[in-house]
Amino acid sequence: MNISKTKQDLWEYLSEVRRPLALYGTGDGADKIISILENHGLKDLIAAVFASDGFVRERTFHGFKVMSYGDCCKALAPKDFIVLVCFGSSRPEVLSQVEKIASEHELYVPDVPVYGSILFDRGFFEENIPDIEEVFSHLSDDISRNCYVNYINYKLTGNITYLSDCESGPDDEFGLLDGISEGCFVDLGAYYGDTLIRYLKKYPCLKRAVAVEPESHSFKRLEKCAEELESEGFGITCINALVGSSTGTEQVSTARGRGTRALPNSNVELKNTRSIDVVTVDSLDIGKAGFIKFDVEGSELAAIDGAKDTILRDRPVMKIACYHRSEDVFALVKKVLEIRPDYKVYMRHTRCIPGWDTDFYFI
């Protein structure tokens, strides 16, 4: 099976053409991309930095004046520059702007790991072809196989046409999840309760939920959401903790944001920190698990390890995010099937750049 016929990854292509680069965005994603460009001897190709109109202001980023897209085009004219998008979004108006720019200039959205330091480049792909092909062989429908092939090719090239070729609607997953049986909904990475509402109201057989969220500001909103659901008859337990392979404590950043975990082997910088409990699924008092959602900021593999007994006992339907670390596209499936080889495996990607909002489903 030839998952990808790509002869070059994005970084090799940029090294070959050596054209000026305009970076779109000035956040953490841009920092990571600049670091990768530097590691590949390409930092000197950066010619400009621009932002969306509402974020320009009078400022600089890595020594470049932050411009609007229009000013960037004027400043670099008549050079044939390449745009690298350095942020993530699923907002329709942002995606429309990216598509507009892509119609006018060559544009890529580099795939860089949200957590960890392993880059999904051609070398990493070729090293892991046996595992990637094994996972492909386990996928249970044509939509999943198409999604997997396009997703791998996107990660190698940064070409967003691969993402658009594997998009599913946000409600398409309901066709997969109809097999959820009565039991507890375990929401790992519950944020402010959006997925509690989504799944509890869709699947009334889930009468009870345990929601785990580490980020303190989101947790306060989660508790308010839980109170409203409890008034409608649902039983909700909210836990302010990380999820891992064993119980204990860990240091996390106190900075506000959805990405809370700061692991020693991640690419998240530890600055101001606080101590927080780490729980496992197996340590929770959940009774029978009917559905588990894993979206735990790069700790999905560890969280699966910590849910092994529950998975063996209950065989819950599971939805597992697979976009935080480069190895997630094969390691997560292998891990689950080592525990229970009787799952059917599916994959879906909903509209977003870069390739976030991509999940495996175990049915």
Predicted features and spans:
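Phosphate/nucleotide-binding beta-alpha loop and adjacent structural elements of enzyme active sites
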Residues: M1-K43, S52-I363
